[in-house]
Regions:
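N-terminal Sec-pathway targeting helices
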Residues: 1-9
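Hydrophobic membrane-insertion alpha-helices, especially the h-region
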Residues: 8-20
């Protein structure tokens, strides 16, 4: 009976917190603001997306993943924030782009600025890989992944295409499918077929699921191709920690049990 009352109490707290969060959550308005938030989201497990290198602040530990610079050691050691769906893909067909390129779109087209700052589309990347990939699309390539040492990213400059390592192909696909739906981007039947195949072939990882929840707490929504998110969880941990710290004995045990039951709902 007591446990049920505690669960009911926690449910009320969760709904109150969720209601407040739904009002307070505001997606970043600029790419610069989005990059600052992205750094915080990825700080607990800092790995570059395409190569799996560890990094600290803006410096990449190339030895941690056996990365060998292809051409530019200086840029290779620098961390950059990469749009998986390139800004060019998002904006090049818009009127603002035709008038003045990306900068003009950022300053004058709110729809483009929102897509440019979407945290679901931002990943940490080695600067050289980011530059080499440019605005190339993704696809399968018949080439040995040896351009960057043990990093298994492949860039074919002649074909203007890149092939990500297997570990992130599913994530790439789900980001592309999400961005296409969210911002009504054009996608060829061939690309859709590829991304749907990758989505099926490479299931969502726990890391990807966790990131989706964290990003949702900053954006106000998740990537549905990754899975459901609980906005009520955003900031709820801090509330519960305070309650648990202030409780003692049997009450503390009851709160823990009730929280577990609530999280399973």
């Amino acid at each position: 009976m007591v446990a049920k009352k505690i669960v009911s109490l926690l449910s009320g707290i969760a709904l109150a917190v969720a209601g407040s969060l739904l009002t307070d959550i505001e997606p970043p308005e600029t790419f610069g603001a989005a990059k600052k938030i992205a750094r915080e989201i990825h700080a607990d497990d800092p790995l570059t997306f395409y190569c799996g290198c560890r990094y600290r602040d803006n410096r990449v530990d190339l030895a941690s993943c056996g990365y060998q610079p292809r051409k530019s050691p200086q840029r290779a050691s620098r961390l950059e924030w990469e749009h998986v769906v390139p800004a060019w893909v998002i904006g090049h067909q818009r009127q603002c782009w035709k008038k003045g390129g990306r900068e003009h779109c950022t300053a004058n087209d709110p729809a483009f600025a929102a897509a440019e700052a979407d945290l679901h589309n931002l990943v940490p990347a080695i600067g050289e890989v980011n530059g080499d990939r440019s605005n190339f699309g993704f696809g399968m390539l018949n080439r040995k992944p040896d351009q960057y040492g043990r990093c298994r990213m492949v860039v074919d400059f002649q074909a203007r295409k890149a092939m990500p390592r297997e570990e992130v192909r599913g994530a790439v696909a789900r980001i592309y499918l999400y961005m296409h739906d969210r911002y009504r981007l054009r996608m060829s039947p061939q690309d859709r077929k590829l991304y749907e195949a990758w989505n099926r072939q490479y299931p969502v990882s726990e890391r990807e699921r966790r990131r989706n929840q964290e990003v949702a707490c900053q954006m106000g929504w998740g990537n549905p191709y990754v899975g459901e998110v609980g906005l009520w969880r955003c900031g709820f941990g801090g509330v519960m920690t305070s309650l648990l710290d202030g409780a003692g004995g049997v009450m503390q045990d009851g709160l823990r049990d009730a929280l577990k039951a609530l999280q399973q709902r």
